[in-house]
């Protein structure tokens, strides 16, 4: 099967094009740093495989995710490259395009965001550009799919009759050095003359990953040649001279290809940015937007729908299943397992799907509109005080959906200590798995202020992440503040198709989790409540679950929720935070009173909020722990990521409850 890779700058629509060409769905967002690892999809019409590589401005990697690109181009086998560029930022995008052309591999250029360029009054004669580069160019609008069908039909012809032809003349002295380097590379390695020239150029540009691919003897020889030509060029260094020549080439190339308008048509966008990123009013606007989202999720739309679903699952559906099982003569043990274990456990989580869908819809809307990137800029000013940059806030925002991709997104951070700090604090972000716990308790104890209470938990998670990062960056992970540079994407009206796909995929993942982790956890919890030291079908107060819960309940007694039932729910919470709710449903369904009534009797508003604080901050779920181990390559950091949140959760919850208990 033929392999093709898709490359481009961050936030030019690579993943949108990947989805359009493969029919799959990968997470997309109107901001940079969404793709942090290689993703593979099967092209439609069985054309081959498409590899989506992380966005990069240059083939000299400065962050962990960018090393994936250079490593793939040097070491993997592929039939051709699809370089997607932003038509509204063509000059800047051509920096990477030129480097890819210097590979002298079959390449197509996808001219994306033609619609954005047109709205700005930018005119591009892509036919003329195609003739100049001798490379096929396809205008597309990846987010709507316009032009992608034509591109898909042509991909199978990529490379047919291809002849290497691209070459920039870097001047006599540098070209002589490149020639000498090529001879060394071809003699000492298996690279052909085109690969050798590419390697030589990248070596002169101080691409350290290229140097790492070569043996020390070759590196020493090439370094000697680079040092010699460094002294010969008039510029500060050979790298600066080559960059100057390359920039001149691009300017000449685009001179009669791109026509810009006389006046700036982004004036309105700039005015909005001055308000949304204002150092005084920007943050209140963000908090107001988040309050509005939570108000819609928990009061206006989400909760009423969840109540209807809860009534259906707990009533009509459960009664129907019982009737069918009685008719079929299913043994009592299985009947109890299915109704009191599986339906009660999984159903108690599924009832929150409407709220999850509403929340995901609005988060996707903020992402696709371009607003989230502005929040990263806004937070950069604040995060400097805590030893981080705005680039760390991007993974943190992703953590509102799930902590696992947020930890992986930290690859885009160049500074290794800042990357590690971000990984360690990311689990404090309120992921969707915690949302059912919040929804259950705020619906019982804080009906009049549900949105404010949930917002306070999200804000608390961010504050605790900042405080911990301050400690880490001043002690074991001390580092200099990094400069945060981010490209603010164009504001755009969110695509209904994109919003639907994004919301659907996230909700589907939540439901899929209910069918795996939560299903398994519910079965185990029910069995532990069914079996005890004295046999099976015992009273729950004599079960193994009661024994485990009593031990942990004793430990959390000072936190305000020291019942054995609450203690028993904390252990499976390590598997997945949603299992906490399913465990409660199973444990409390063993009695005659309903879940809501029992929780009202065992918790107070104070202890309920304390419980939510503990759930917010304590041990990350097993998937998150696995992601931390994968990204840090260290059991030491992984152990720290498990232990310190538990200690933090215990101490903060203790302080909150004990002080609150003095006044309530």
Curated annotation (Swiss-Prot):
Its main location: membrane. It is a multi-pass membrane protein. Signal peptide: none annotated. GTP 2 binds at residues 33-37. One of its GO terms (cellular component) is plasma membrane. The chain crosses the membrane at residues 281-301, 342-362, 382-402, 425-445, 452-472, 516-536, 544-564, 567-587, 608-628, 637-657. One of its GO terms (molecular function) is GTP binding. It is found in: Cell membrane. Keywords: Cell membrane, GTP-binding, Ion transport, Iron, Iron transport, Membrane, Nucleotide-binding, Transmembrane, Transmembrane helix, Transport. Residues 1-161 form the FeoB-type G domain. The keyword Transcription does not apply. Disulfide bonds: none annotated. It comes from the Bacteria. GTP binds at residues 112-115, 141-143. GTP 1 binds at residues 8-15. PROSITE patterns: G_FEOB. CDD domains: FeoB. GTP 3 binds at residues 52-55. Probable transporter of a GTP-driven Fe(2+) uptake system. Belongs to the TRAFAC class TrmE-Era-EngA-EngB-Septin-like GTPase superfamily. FeoB GTPase (TC 9.A.8) family. This is Fe(2+) transporter FeoB. It comes from Staphylococcus aureus (strain MSSA476). The gene is feoB.
